[in-house]
UniProtKB/Swiss-Prot annotation:
Record InterPro entries: GTP_cyclohydrolase_FolE2/MptA, GTP_cyclohydrolase_MptA
Segment forming the signal sequence: none
Gene name for this UniProt entry: mptA
Iron is among the record's keywords: yes
Annotated protein name in UniProt: GTP cyclohydrolase MptA
Site for May be catalytically important, residues: C158
Amino acid sequence: MSQQLPDVQASSPDVSVGLSRVGVTGVEKLVKLHRPNDRPIVLMAEFDVFVDLPSWRKGADMSRNMEVVDEMLEEAVSEPALSVEDVCGDVAERLIEKHDYTTQAEVRMEAEYMIREETPATDRPTQATADIIASATADEDGNTREEIGCHVVGMTVCPCSQGMSESRARDVLEGLDVDRDTIDAFLEEVPQPGHSQRGHATLTVETSGDPDVDLRTLIDIARDSMSARIYNLAKRPDEDHMTFESHSDAKFVEDCVRSMANGLLEEYPDLPDDTIVRMEQSNDESIHQHNAHAERVAEFGQLRREVRD
């Protein structure tokens, strides 16, 4: 066999069509996040890494490319990083430098993030999880955009279902000769039942360079956009708290997305106008065989104008 094996990937393809993304998915790496005066946070992260491919090239040197990708990821995660989006940005920029045939590189990362907290009523220590979402795109002109965000779970209560329950309760109380003021006061203090859903909220922020946002703040915004937070540990007072809180703030799936937008505007009113915000809410319905979904992708400047109007 010849010592010089043919470079098939560098040959011309049978069909001259360029490809938007070619790469590897599911690359697992440990990532350490720096914390001042504390041990770093260690994440088991999964990376997807892509480059674009011109129409004149058959392949992207997948096996050789994987060595480069693995080497760059090892270098990027060898020391504690300030942010996961910076790790993605660093790898994307190195990919552009390493490949003379590509014009754009994209790196995506997901990891599970543990949150230490206390139960809402009994103040018992517990832990919650959130999925971190980070990505970066670098191009041949030296431009890099980075994205950071999260996916969290919570609960919601249907306002329509609750409204029907409240109407029924009002009719019953009127039939028992309870006066109108007392009925109004009771219904104001005691929210009526509505069917509940497990809610899934996703919130990401993308800017040119490193987004000037805090991951924990984004997690809080996403969790608080639903009717109530949920907890792994819950004694009876905690269950009562979550039930009461959720029914006191019943929300449609659309309301949750709008709450995310409003929460982001309140926390970060000065983000650049060209910041891209992605907000999604999916609710697992309890009384239907289908689920509910709403989303919005918008520039921050547009969101700011809509809320002000």
